[in-house]
Amino acid sequence: LMVSTWASATSSKRISPCRPRQFLLRAACAVCCLVNVLAAQADEVYLEPTAFVSQAFDGQPPQAGKLWVAPELNARVKDILGNALPLRQKYWRQGERTVWILEAIGRDKPITAGYVVEQAAITRTAILIYRESRGAEVRHPFFTDQFKGATLKRDGALDRHIDGITGATLSVHAISALARVALLLDEAARAKPP
């Protein structure tokens, strides 16, 4: 009787060949869930694009317009961003003020930013949606206020130096590039009748 009890006890401790597979499957599921949770947390909506447009026009936004992006303009945009814009770019215009909602890749994911341009100078910059896992400091006024009054020089560069943020270098470059694009698009929009 003792021998059979000992045999059953030792045999129950044996690991079946299915158990390592179950463990690996459960571990893989846990990792996938964690990645999804982290990815969901990385999408930070700081301000809805429609709210930004409304604020830019004191709650009375005009109808959205479309700017046909000419091949020469798109070539300049591609030099700045590394990719071209769609053939029609949505924007809002009232008098000399234009509003642009633009996206660029920071490190791995798109950053959505809004720019208000008036008389060929940026009057407001806001980070609307930030999807990166790092570098979200670019959303704060201490960074975005650097763009107030920025214009384009003849060579297409901003007329001022934009201070970087440690750990957010690629996001800083993306936001600066989008500022240049917003000014280029504003220039093209002002060249056509309202």
Question: Positions of the model-derived regions?
Answer:
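Flexible, solvent-exposed loop/hinge segments and secondary-structure transition points
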Residues: 41-173, 177-194
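Bacterial N-terminal signal peptides that target proteins for export
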Residues: 13-28
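Bacterial N-terminal signal peptides
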Residues: 26-36
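Hydrophobic alpha-helical elements and their junctions with loops/disorder across both membrane
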Residues: 14, 34-37, 186-189
